[in-house]
Amino acid sequence: MQCIRCPAILALLALVLCGPSVSSQLDREQSDNQDLDLELRQHWLLERARSAGLLSQEWSKRAVEELLAQMSLPEADVQREAEDASMATGGRMNLERSVDSTNNLPPRERKAGCKNFYWKGFTSC
């Protein structure tokens, strides 16, 4: 009787000990995925700022950290903060032009007889 109990107890003990490690491994993988998503988002935000010319200016380390913290908040928090800010300003909203312009306008057509500057001198169009 004890011979049958011993392997059964060992099997149950092995299941109990292996159970938390599997769930903790899943938690670690989810945490790693969230960290990777956050790093990718911050990299994307830095690239947008660089393409907009914002990184050519002098920024203090604290200002950059605050900017990244605000931009990495979930969208619901950002909308809630925007609503709070609009209530604080009396409901007025200042609109700004987006960095990623989807409105790609063709370049101006040059008039006949116009002159362009070339490094050797002026040339006609």
From Swiss-Prot:
Chief location bin: secreted
Residues the record lists as Pyrrolidone carboxylic acid modifications: Q25
Annotated segments matching region Disordered: 82-107
Propeptide residues according to the Swiss-Prot or TrEMBL record: 25-97
GO BP: regulation of cell migration
Keywords: Cleavage on pair of basic residues, Disulfide bond, Hormone, Hydroxylation, Pyrrolidone carboxylic acid, Secreted, Signal
Residue positions where 5-hydroxylysine is found in the record: K120
Annotated function: Somatostatin inhibits the release of somatotropin.
Protein name per UniProt: Somatostatin-2
Lineage: Eukaryota, Metazoa, Chordata, Craniata, Vertebrata
